[in-house]
Amino acid sequence: METVGRFQAGDYVVFACLFVVSSGIGVFFAIKERNKAPSKEFLVGGRQMSCGPVALSLTASFMSAVTVIGAPADVYRFGASYVIFGVAYTFVVFFTAELFLPVFYRSGITSTYEYLELRFCKLVRVAATLIYIIQTILYTGVVVYAPALALNQVTGFDLWGSIFATGIVCTFYCTLGGLKAVVWTDAFQMVVMVVGFLTVLIQGSSRAGGIENVWSTSRTGGRLQVFDFDVSPLRRHTFWTLSVGGTFTWLGIYGVNQSTIQRCISCKTEGHARWALYLNLLGLWIILFCAVVSGLIMYSYYSHCDPWSSGLISAPDQLMPYFVMEILGAFPGLPGLFVACAFSGTLSTVAASINALATVMYEDFVSQCFPDLSNRAASWISKALCVAFGVACTTMAVAASYMGGIVQAALSIHGMCGGPVLGLFSLGILFPFTNLKGAVGGLIVGISLSFWVGVGAFIYPAPSNNTHALELNTAGCNITAAAFEPTSATVTQLTSDRNWLADSWYSMSYLYYSAVGFIGTVAAGLLITLLTGPMDPKLLKPGMTRSVKEVMCFCTEKFTEADLGEGKEDVGDFGKAWEKHPDQGCTLRMDEKFRCSCDNQQENGNTNAGFDHNETSIVQKKL
């Protein structure tokens, strides 16, 4: 592989500024919050965050360096159909904001998995927490290693230096500043990501002959064929796999993921939390747009000489760094800006993961074993957990360098684990009659199905005709025949002992792994519940479940207010209302004209230990 340039002093300075500013934010909040010892202040920011920084933090955390580097390469090879993920993002944010968020926010919990104990039992909570910890450590390690390797091979940027710097800096500001430092650092890193992308878009389009030429070349090369309505689940990317499969995959990441919900419940009101999610949707669209256009510009620039097929680079993930070094290498500091852009995605993802891991470990294990810890002891333990998980994630990144092809399996863990856990929460929230046996049995079935298809796909790779990779041209390359490696070398070599499962079940699009786990969990959970005897929904206090009418009836909170006995307080301000009186005994009513109202319904007995059961009243309010 040839290199088009190496990092210069100016590039290292620009890149170092990212780490210095990120660390500085952690120091700032450590000093500012030094007299606030409670662990809740450290783990959820005192529940006083506003929607703006939380929205930026959410976007930055889930648009990792894998997106910054991998998405443009995907568009380069398979076309702009990747943009359909925007449809999936829309559904994901809606269901998170209207279905899952109200339940988590109003219950006053810190760990999302605490809900599972309130709804089912501690065993279910522990199982889901362990799944989350394993999946997050594994995925976070890969998120650190994969982009560092691609950048190292193209730019010469030090591999181990970047890995250890990422782990040390993230652990540093997470430990010092807690969630507030994570959120504000993510906000800064989101700005860096956008600036880095814009730099590539402006210079790249100029070098490719302008946007009009980019559009024309992309159309000629088939990159603008966005809508493929083939319903086959075996096709890698179609409208249905990206929109439906993408929705299930990202809903498992957003809807019930500790990292997302932790920042949402850190908001001062439920209204701020909702706004954070919807503003985050705008951020997701912006990053997605930048990634797709970058891929089209890159294809237009290399339309006559593909560097991957011609052997100039050894893997598709190196396309974006190679392109950046070629178009920005003559401008001191700009390659460093792009690397800062890529590592902003990595830093935000790793920091969010470390903070979330520390939270679930403390809430789901430490506080359960030692319920009488002082505030100061709890705060120090929370910080120690941040350090421990920072070391674990960095160690996982180092281990990824020795894993070879296992890295691909690790990147699929989110889908394989996220779907069954999403199904578990859906059983609890949407189906009030689901019993404990149904929840446990459904989770086992869902995990088994999703890992069956995921591991099977790793052992028996899907045939290349399922991916529909578009043609790449090397006619304009100034290379010798001996140096040329044809594109056909990348075609998956299929073994002769493949059985019928290999070409059907194991060849399913990776975006459906989460859907398989979700459907398996819900279907098995409901069947087992019906066979073993459904639970009486009256045994559950209101707030543990959420009906479809409540999800779709947007006026529910807007036209009601809570009387807490100490003055009126808007129901939209559930951060305070539910902290004092989380069980409001509210039942939604809808008349024949589809007008919503919320009637008070008091129930005696069958209380849930997770809620405070003082009386409240809900009254209709005309706006």
From Swiss-Prot:
The keyword Plastid does not apply. InterPro entries: Na/Glc_symporter_sf (IPR038377), Na/solute_symporter (IPR001734), SMCT2_SLC5sbd (IPR042700), Sodium:Solute_Symporter_SSF (IPR051163). It is found in: Apical cell membrane. It comes from the Eukaryota. Glycans are attached at N465, N478. Residues 32-50, 105-129, 180-181, 258-276, 344-386, 434-438, 532-623 are cytoplasmic. Residues 1-10, 72-83, 151-158, 203-236, 298-322, 408-412, 460-510 are extracellular. GO terms for cellular component: apical plasma membrane. Keywords: Cell membrane, Glycoprotein, Ion transport, Membrane, Sodium, Sodium transport, Symport, Transmembrane, Transmembrane helix, Transport. The chain crosses the membrane at residues 11-31, 51-71, 84-104, 130-150, 159-179, 182-202, 237-257, 277-297, 323-343, 387-407, 413-433, 439-459, 511-531. It holds the Pfam family SSF. It is a multi-pass membrane protein. Its main location: membrane. GO terms for molecular function: monocarboxylate:sodium symporter activity; secondary active monocarboxylate transmembrane transporter activity; symporter activity. One of its GO terms (biological process) is monocarboxylic acid transport. It catalyses: (S)-lactate(out) + Na(+)(out) = (S)-lactate(in) + Na(+)(in); nicotinate(out) + Na(+)(out) = nicotinate(in) + Na(+)(in); pyruvate(out) + Na(+)(out) = pyruvate(in) + Na(+)(in); propanoate(out) + Na(+)(out) = propanoate(in) + Na(+)(in). Acts as an electroneutral and low-affinity sodium (Na(+))-dependent sodium-coupled solute transporter. Catalyzes the transport across the plasma membrane of many monocarboxylates such as lactate, pyruvate, nicotinate, propionate, butyrate and beta-D-hydroxybutyrate. Belongs to the sodium:solute symporter (SSF) (TC 2.A.21) family. This is Sodium-coupled monocarboxylate transporter 2. It comes from Danio rerio.
